[in-house]
Design a protein with these regions (language model features):
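Short, positively charged interaction helices/loops
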Residues: 96-103
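Active-site scaffold of zinc-dependent metalloenzymes
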Residues: 4-59, 72-93
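Polybasic, lysine-enriched low-complexity intrinsically disordered terminal tails
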Residues: 1-5, 102
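Active-site recognition of the HExxH zinc-binding catalytic motif
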Residues: 63-72
Length: 103
């Protein structure tokens, strides 16, 4: 179950991925390299972290979160497999009506 780090911070939460606790941060565009929408640390990092640009919305945000979660769970998997799988899962969830709810 994902949990917000603090009730006051809607841009951070923790969750288990691949059996490890991960920090998920929704960051400003300037906090992440301009050539990416999100990134994923390594599971062996002291505080494994996924960063997602706040500016990404809708189905693209869903795809991005799934993409980075797949990297966290399967760090040795190819980018091609992660891209394809994340997009297919996001398309399925979107078609089933899943949408982001403001907390």
């Amino acid at each position: 179950v994902a949990k917000r780090k603090q009730k006051q911070d809607p841009n951070a939460l923790t969750t288990k991925l691949g059996g490890k606790e991960w920090h998920i941060k929704f960051v400003r565009s300037r906090e992440i390299p301009s050539d990416r929408w999100g990134d994923c640390g390594h599971p062996e990092d002291p505080q494994p972290t996924i960063r997602v640009r706040r500016a990404v919305e809708g189905k693209n945000r869903m795809d991005l979160i799934i993409h980075e979660a797949l990297h966290a769970i399967y760090p040795d998997e190819t980018e091609e497999m992660v891209n394809r799988s994340a997009t297919e899962i996001a398309n399925l969830l979107w078609a089933c009506g899943y949408r982001r709810v403001e907390m």
